[in-house]
């Protein structure tokens, strides 16, 4: 009911959408000026490099030779999901029907403001040059993927110089598929690339990039009792401040929370968002930690199912590493969702699982997990296998930064010696059982991830889903 009502509201506001210019001249001075808040948007905003790079060079250590590269990437910048858009449009309706003159932080709404969701067909979808609110927007998912492709060629181009035909893998989410295709486009026309579209339906079982979708035991509300302890009074403070500046507006804590999503997704679509300017720095910090907390306990180390779910992809990754000498394909590129990447990183052990996050306060000294550092829109996790003299090593590069394995980083470039890595990986997956923990057999007969090995005969081409 709400969905229909909100869509009706939006439709009415879009009657003259065809006459709306793609941005205004005044936008030029604002676009690209809000990068400092990206780390506080919980991964909903544009891509940025991992801040904790430890000063380690991204370059291949001297006198070493790359043997294999794997990448698991998140789709690029997008419009909000349908469910998130409901909240944003409900709050927009409240603002658009305010009869007074806006004052204070909301005064920009007096200046012929154009709501950034101009067509509901864009919900769930990648932002592109065609659907962006402003043609000058530098943060579209389309351009991010193409930049990523150019960065890939600069860093690893020699790995595909003599391999003109290879596969790229994506979940059958429309936005993931679009990201993969834009990435392929960014590589240029030198390569003959086969895009394999892998189902993320629960019936895919283990043969998927999105194992949590194949997990009937997955609980979206797990650990809510912990999360409810987090102090969210700052949200009512935002609402009260804006209401005081604008008598009769009657914003709620829910509206205040929605403004953070509005801020992030408007930047994705427009290149900047005046809504972002309503927050104090303290409020951004409190919101950001709330996102860290929710992620840690619902898609990260704080949820005991996650390590088994992430093992589905991690086991396949380790198998590819072991077969690097016999596999013709030396580069393995995949695109999926943030949840899948977080599950994967949890199993690897890159995300600290020894110290649970507290909901009692913001732990500035002890908090080593920041959701947006790992999974901004367009996130990418690279696994590098390289040989130096007679020894071989593995290391991870997350969003442009080398992130060492804490207990295995004595190799060149803070890498992990290959046999030590295999021992480490075995310990990480010990006790995990994706099929059993998730009760996969109740929804699928597929018990193994095989698409990396059988794509050339099966030719995966699942129907795209708008999610």
Swiss-Prot record:
CDD domains named in the record: HP_HAP_like
Source species of the chain: Saccharomyces cerevisiae (strain ATCC 204508 / S288c) (Baker's yeast)
Post-translational modification: Glycosylated during secretion across the membrane.
Gene Ontology CC, one term: extracellular region
GO molecular function, one term: acid phosphatase activity
GN (gene name): PHO11
GO biological process, one term: phosphate-containing compound metabolic process
Regulation: induction: S.cerevisiae has 2 types of acid phosphatase: one is constitutive and the other is repressible by inorganic phosphate.
Keywords: Glycoprotein, Hydrolase, Signal
A Pfam family recorded for this sequence: His_Phos_2
Enzyme Commission (EC) number: 3.1.3.2
Sugar attachment sites: 97, 162, 192, 250, 315, 356, 390, 439, 445, 461
Transmembrane segments: none
Misc. comment: Present with 1460 molecules/cell in log phase SD medium.
Family of the protein in this entry: Belongs to the histidine acid phosphatase family.
Signal peptide: 1-17
Protein name per Swiss-Prot or TrEMBL: Acid phosphatase PHO11
Cited InterPro entries: Acid_Pase_AS, His_Pase_clade-2, His_PPase_superfam, Histidine_acid_Pase_euk
């Amino acid at each position: 009911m709400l969905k229909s009502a909100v869509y009706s509201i939006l439709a009415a506001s879009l009657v003259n959408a065809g006459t709306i210019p793609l941005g205004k001249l005044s936008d030029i001075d604002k676009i690209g000026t809000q990068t400092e808040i990206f780390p506080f948007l919980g991964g909903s905003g544009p891509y940025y490099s991992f801040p904790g790079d430890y000063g380690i060079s991204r370059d291949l250590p001297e006198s070493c030779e790359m043997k294999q590269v794997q990448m698991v990437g998140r789709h690029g910048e997008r419009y909000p999901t349908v469910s998130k858009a409901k909240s944003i449009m409900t709050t927009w309706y409240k603002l658009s029907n305010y009869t007074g003159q806006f004052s204070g932080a909301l005064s920009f709404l007096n200046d012929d403001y154009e709501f950034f969701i101009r067509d509901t067909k864009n919900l769930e979808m990648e932002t592109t040059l065609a659907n962006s609110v402003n043609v000058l927007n530098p943060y579209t998912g389309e351009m991010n993927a193409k930049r990523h492709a150019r960065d890939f060629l600069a860093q690893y181009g020699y790995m595909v110089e003599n391999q003109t035909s290879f596969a790229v893998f994506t979940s059958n989410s429309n936005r993931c598929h679009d990201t993969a295709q834009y990435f392929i486009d960014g590589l240029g026309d030198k390569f003959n690339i086969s895009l394999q579209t892998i189902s993320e339906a629960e019936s895919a079982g283990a043969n998927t990039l999105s194992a949590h979708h194949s997990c009937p035991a997955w609980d979206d509300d797990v650990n809510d009792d912990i999360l409810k302890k987090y102090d969210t009074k700052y949200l009512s403070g935002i609402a009260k401040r804006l209401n005081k500046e604008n008598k009769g507006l009657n914003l709620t804590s829910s509206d205040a929370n929605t403004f953070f999503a509005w801020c992030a997704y408007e930047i994705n679509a427009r290149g900047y968002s005046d809504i972002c300017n309503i927050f104090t720095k303290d409020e951004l910090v409190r919101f950001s930690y709330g996102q860290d907390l929710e992620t840690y306990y619902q898609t990260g180390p704080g949820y005991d199912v996650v390590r088994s779910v992430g093992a589905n992809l991690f086991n396949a990754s380790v198998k590819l590493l072991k077969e690097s000498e016999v596999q013709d394909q030396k580069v393995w590129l995949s695109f999926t969702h943030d949840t899948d990447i977080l599950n994967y990183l949890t199993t690897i052990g890159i995300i600290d699982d020894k110290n649970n996050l507290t909901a009692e306060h913001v732990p500035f000294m002890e908090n080593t997990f920041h959701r947006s550092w790992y999974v901004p829109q367009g996130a990418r996790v690279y696994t590098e296998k390289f040989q130096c003299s007679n020894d071989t090593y593995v290391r991870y590069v997350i969003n442009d930064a080398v992130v060492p394995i804490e207990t295995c980083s004595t190799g060149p470039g803070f890498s992990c010696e290959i046999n030590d890595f295999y021992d480490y990986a075995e310990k990480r997956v010990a006790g995990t059982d994706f099929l059993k923990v998730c009760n996969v057999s109740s929804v699928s007969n597929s018990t193994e991830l095989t698409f990396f090995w059988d794509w050339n005969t099966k030719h995966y081409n699942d129907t795209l889903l708008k999610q």
